[in-house]
């Protein structure tokens, strides 16, 4: 129990200093993630592998908006169920952290990233 409290506090402190979204879901159940990007912004979902700012981003969906489909990677199993809106199997990302990239432009020239933290119920 103490470990959960400490983890919750560390996550909250991390989210205060960086843009972050905390969402609750039932573990190992399908979950439609709430998009933290502002209205009228495009969003693209990634798994960030590594903790550095320059860490590699692995894209979860591909295709044009309105016709996006999940990319299934062997190392992630069936993590991504659908893309519009994003639906995943509620579990911690197999590696790294879940990131959504928000941009007002379709080409994502200017963007900001939001880390999505899942709290399991």
Curated annotation (Swiss-Prot):
Keyword Disulfide bond: yes
Domain SARS ORF8 Ig-like positions: 19-121
Residues making up the signal peptide according to the UniProt record: 1-15
InterPro entries: ORF8_bat_SARS-CoV_HKU3-1-like, ORF8_betacoronavirus, SARS_ORF8_IG
Alphabetized Pfam families for the sequence: bCoV_NS8 (PF12093)
Other known facts: This protein corresponds nearly to the fused 8a and 8b proteins of SARS-CoV.
Name this protein carries in UniProt: Non-structural protein 8
Source organism per UniProt: Bat coronavirus Rp3/2004
Lineage per the UniProt record: Viruses, Riboviria, Orthornavirae, Pisuviricota, Pisoniviricetes
